[in-house]
Amino acid sequence: MVPNKFKLAVLVSGRGSNLQAIIDSIEKNALQAEIALVVSNVKDAYALERAHKHGLEGLFLDPKSYPDRNSYEQDLMEKIQSKSVDLICLAGYMRILGKHFIEAFSDRIINIHPSLLPAFPGLNVQKRALEHGARFSGCTVHY
């Protein structure tokens, strides 16, 4: 690892446009980081293909293959901890993480949410914003 670079784990569920933005920023030296691990909870998420195209380790962890949420999150935690990451980026990750996971990585998780919170939490936020008649929208990045 190059000194003074953050070691990242990126959690994804879809196309990976946020992952690509992170990769691009690293490649342009605009972000002093390296991606140690990309994990998806969706088998055919294009984000995993993006990761592999850039030589990054990408894993699919199927939440349905675990007996319960805690078992899934425990395995996810172990995989992340094995990479000694400094920061976890939830970049289009469409699962709500439990208290135990959040506490294990206290002050080391950053989330990108595709709406201006608290106006539109949850899923399908842009659609809901349009249906609500919102005059503007945006995204929220919270730590």
Regions picked out by a protein language model, each given a short descriptive name:
Residues 1-143:
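One-carbon transfer enzymes
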